[in-house]
Amino acid sequence: MLKPVRIALDAMGGDVGPQAIIPGAARALQRLGDVRFRFYGDRAQVEPLLRQHPALADVSSVHHTDVTVRMDDKPSQALRAGRRVSSMWQAIEAVKTGEADVVLSAGNTGALMAMAKVCLRMLPGIDRPAIAGIWPTLRGRSIVLDIGATIGADAPHLVDLAIMGAAMARIVLKVERPRIGLLNVGVEEIKGLEEVKTASRLLRQLTLPSLVYHGFVEGDDIGRGTVDVVVTEGFTGNIALKTAEGTAKQIAQYIREEMGRSFWSKIGYLLARRAFDALKQKLDPRQINGGVFLGLDGIVIKSHGGSDTIGTANAIEISYAMARYEILSKIRESLDLTREARAALLVEGTGSLERMAAPHRARQDELGENKVVGADQSMTAKATGT
């Protein structure tokens, strides 16, 4: 019999904190069953809500904290004020100590990444983290990474993203050998930044039993579902994500305006209501809520800061899947199989994407936005969901 998945929840994270986290967990429990929850936050706020859901209370424990990381805190501020004492830190630490299998927070993304890097550290051989998101497509769903953890990437890092993204796709998409595409300005091999072209050559050279390299893909291929995993660096990935979210809202607004324009349009809406409801479901970002932090030596999931009960429940289901199907073991296995080949790739050096990102990171370090207290590491604070 499988052991229940233990999920540590930052109960104070997000725009409404426990008002969304607790009922979201109750909703997820109805679907999952074999799960246990550890809530970290203000006991006075968490326990009254928990009592409204007896089934959830039976499989949960509450761990009081006095400090909450604010949504507008800089990562350096969050670490100074919240290290070891905040709900976010203690939820992450539960994974490190083995008390939980996965941590979920709807809090400040930059702070969550900074704390996770300090507390959990990176996987051996991985220098920089990534955020992977689930993307609705015409063929179902795909994985896109990086969607905002790190700005700029060299070719070996893009290869690492492909390996980690493939591991996630095997769990989420149930595909044994996911098709991988590198996001580029064209599909021709001569197009794009040198670093992306180098990464493409490296992926073709590697013999990876865990994935199939498709080649370059363009922006419109993401929604088409041309590949299972789209790999890019965090700057372009985050722009693609925000553009898609904005386009979905724009389409929904157009439909609402047209449906209310005349009597006949209202009649048309009523006749096609089932189809419109299905479209609304596909465009609803709550259905794919939950960004996975890859590259860390522990499983960390980021829920959108504005998530409601439905969005939270879906993020918990992603958390459950990543832990139940052992995403870390799959990533470690893939990295071990390619360790020597990936080490040889380092001689390729860095290229234009890395040079493009260097001034940005230097400026952020100067402002103190990316300095990690107590460790000689830095990170990119800007990411999704903050």
Curated annotation (Swiss-Prot):
Residues 377-386 have a biased composition (Polar residues). The gene is plsX. This is Phosphate acyltransferase. Belongs to the PlsX family. It comes from Beijerinckia indica subsp. indica (strain ATCC 9039 / DSM 1715 / NCIMB 8712). It holds the Pfam family FA_synthesis. It comes from the Bacteria. The lineage of its organism: Bacteria, Pseudomonadati, Pseudomonadota, Alphaproteobacteria, Hyphomicrobiales. One of its GO terms (biological process) is fatty acid biosynthetic process. It catalyses: a fatty acyl-[ACP] + phosphate = an acyl phosphate + holo-[ACP]. Homodimer. Probably interacts with PlsY. Coiled coil: none annotated. Keywords: Cytoplasm, Lipid biosynthesis, Lipid metabolism, Phospholipid biosynthesis, Phospholipid metabolism, Transferase. GO terms for cellular component: cytoplasm.
